[in-house]
Amino acid sequence: MGFADFFKTFTRERAKEGESPSHWIKCPSCSALMYYKEVIAQHHVCPKCNFHMRIALEDRIEMLCDEGTLIEHDASLEPTDPLTFVDKKSYKKRIEEGKQKTGRASSVLSGECRINGVSTQIVLFNFAFMGGSLGSVEGEKIVRAVNRALEKHQGLVILSTSGGARMQESTYSLMQMAKTSAALARLSQAKLPFISLLTDPTMGGVSASFAFLGDIIIAEPGAMVGFAGARVIKQTIGADLPEGFQTAEFLLEHGLIDMITPRKEMKKTLGDLLRFFNPYDENPCLLHL
């Protein structure tokens, strides 16, 4: 029996009914071969090298939100095409492709949930929709989430995974950087916590605005975080970049973020921080002082 035949027999015997060899996943970092159910159980973290893979929005929801507590808001908001923008495709076409791919109308889900028992407003970026880019709808959803947090005296968690501002909306998308930053300033004035969670990747206009305005900034291990890409920076300055540049570990070492938290500990960490920094959560009587 040749190796190819042996491998087919091995995977066929290991797989249960209805499964196939495609259910084996290779780690992008260490090339370890893992069974897909093991990967799911580990929140898409390699058990061999601890590499944190990119995961779907639905997996993020399951990982962070207490079961059955998420109430989505503003799901009906959809981007328009005020500039009739066309690159290789029209913007309208890209929006439709994003809808078909994700089943959602924008790159952001916003809503209210409980995280380890603590009620909070939450905003989750979806990289599968146009690279998680920030457009006018996404900015509006963030502002509305801030408004609800202010109204209900809750904290806010924003999970970023984005390539930056959406070029197809030009100045409209760039305006969201100032718009979201101004809204978050009101949350800060109200002494309500904003926790910014940076995941791979968090780049461009997102990193240059609300992603780094958190009262507490947390990153996942190995996340790529920055403004311009490393290659562009290297070509611009004409010099080599430090080892590990634009990684979460590099940012922590240089004091730009507060902590790096593994995925399996993220929910408890967020719940503890929200409970500790929001005085209204445990003491609702403070609302009347």
From Swiss-Prot:
InterPro entries: AcCoA_carboxyl_beta, Acetyl_CoA_COase_Trfase_b_su, ClpP/crotonase-like_dom_sf, COA_CT_N, Znf-ACC. Binds 1 zinc ion per subunit. It is found in: Cytoplasm. Its cofactor is Zn(2+). A zinc finger (C4-type) spans 27-49. It catalyses: N(6)-carboxybiotinyl-L-lysyl-[protein] + acetyl-CoA = N(6)-biotinyl-L-lysyl-[protein] + malonyl-CoA. It comes from the Bacteria. PROSITE patterns: COA_CT_NTER. Its main location: cytoplasm. Keywords: ATP-binding, Cytoplasm, Fatty acid biosynthesis, Fatty acid metabolism, Lipid biosynthesis, Lipid metabolism, Metal-binding, Nucleotide-binding, Transferase, Zinc, Zinc-finger. One of its GO terms (biological process) is malonyl-CoA biosynthetic process. GO terms for cellular component: acetate CoA-transferase complex. Residues 23-289 form the CoA carboxyltransferase N-terminal domain. It is an enzyme of class 2 (transferase). One of its GO terms (molecular function) is acetyl-CoA carboxylase activity. Zn(2+) binds at residues 27, 30, 46, 49. PANTHER family: ACETYL-COENZYME A CARBOXYLASE CARBOXYL TRANSFERASE SUBUNIT BETA, CHLOROPLASTIC. Component of the acetyl coenzyme A carboxylase (ACC) complex. Biotin carboxylase (BC) catalyzes the carboxylation of biotin on its carrier protein (BCCP) and then the CO(2) group is transferred by the transcarboxylase to acetyl-CoA to form malonyl-CoA. Acetyl-CoA carboxylase is a heterohexamer composed of biotin carboxyl carrier protein (AccB), biotin carboxylase (AccC) and two subunits each of ACCase subunit alpha (AccA) and ACCase subunit beta (AccD). HAMAP family: AcetylCoA_CT_beta (MF_01395). This is Acetyl-coenzyme A carboxylase carboxyl transferase subunit beta. The gene is accD.
